[in-house]
Amino acid sequence: GWGRTIRTHXSIDLNXGE
């Protein structure tokens, strides 16, 4: 939940995750 979607090593959605 960083407030943004960071795509790295494919695709990692930190909005949902962190």
Curated annotation (Swiss-Prot):
One Gene Ontology term, aspect cellular component: extracellular region
Keywords in alphabetical order: Secreted
Tissue expression summary: Expressed by the venom gland.
Taxonomic superkingdom: Eukaryota
Main localization (coarse): secreted
Compartment list: Secreted
Protein name as annotated: Venom peptide Ocy6
